[in-house]
């Protein structure tokens, strides 16, 4: 297991080459966290991803519908793998490319792609400079990870109304993302036992 940042340096270069060539497979790693580290995610991003994964699992365990808990766990862990390349809105698109190169299943790649905010419409995607398509979470697992991500800032967990106020500060009170987040909250609250 890699512990020091200087110990990872040779591995990071090797992983970068293997990612570009498409020959890497995550079976070579002892854990999913090592995949994040090898992909180049900072310790802050890794800590955030762990927190989101834990929050998402907590949500999944508290609902009265059947979901794939392992997919939720891994989706929470890998949702921000694209932040190894960019911290901009394009990190989801970058994460999709990384996930595909790593051989992630489509269900996991979809979580990475659709986790931004409470989802992004095709119209908003174009405005943000993303490829024109909907980035709206569709499956329960996608919605749970997206929602959990919205409730975690760094590693600090927030309640819905605190997160909503934060969204309003960042996006403005009339942004379509606010309505999507409120709708997402009500949908997930409806699943809770």
Provide a role label for each language-model segment.
Residues 39-40, 115, 171, 185:
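Alpha-helix boundary/capping residues
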Residues 172-193:
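Charged phosphate-binding loop/patch that engages nucleotide di/tri-phosphates or the phosphate backbone
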Residues 2-90, 98, 123-125:
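Acidic/His-rich, divalent-metal-binding segments that scaffold phosphate/diphosphate chemistry
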Residues 51, 82, 118, 187-188, ...:
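Intrinsic structural disorder/low-complexity segments
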Residues 62-167:
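Divalent metal-dependent catalytic cores for phosphoryl transfer on phosphate-bearing substrates
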Residues 12, 33, 148, 158-170, ...:
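Short alpha-helical interface patches
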Residues 55-58, 150, 187:
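Alpha-helical scaffold segments in carbohydrate-active enzymes
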């Amino acid at each position: 297991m890699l512990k020091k940042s200087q110990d990872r340096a040779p591995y990071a270069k090797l992983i970068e080459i293997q990612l570009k060539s498409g020959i890497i497979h995550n079976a070579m790693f002892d854990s999913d966290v090592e995949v994040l580290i090898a992909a180049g995610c900072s310790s802050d991003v890794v800590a955030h991803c762990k927190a989101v994964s834990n929050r998402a699992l907590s949500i999944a365990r508290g609902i009265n519908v059947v979901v794939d808990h392992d997919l939720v766990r891994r989706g929470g862990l890998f949702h921000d793998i694209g932040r190894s390349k960019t911290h901009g809105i394009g990190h989801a698109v970058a994460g999709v490319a990384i996930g595909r190169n790593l051989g992630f299943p489509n269900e996991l790649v979809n979580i990475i792609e659709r986790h931004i905010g409470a989802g992004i419409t095709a119209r908003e995607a174009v405005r943000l400079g993303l490829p024109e398509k909907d980035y709206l979470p569709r499956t329960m697992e996608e919605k749970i990870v997206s929602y959990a991500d919205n409730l975690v800032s760094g590693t600090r967990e927030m309640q819905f109304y605190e997160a909503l106020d934060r969204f309003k500060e960042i996006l403005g009170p009339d942004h379509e993302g606010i309505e999507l987040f409120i709708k997402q909250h009500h949908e997930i609250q409806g699943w809770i036992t």
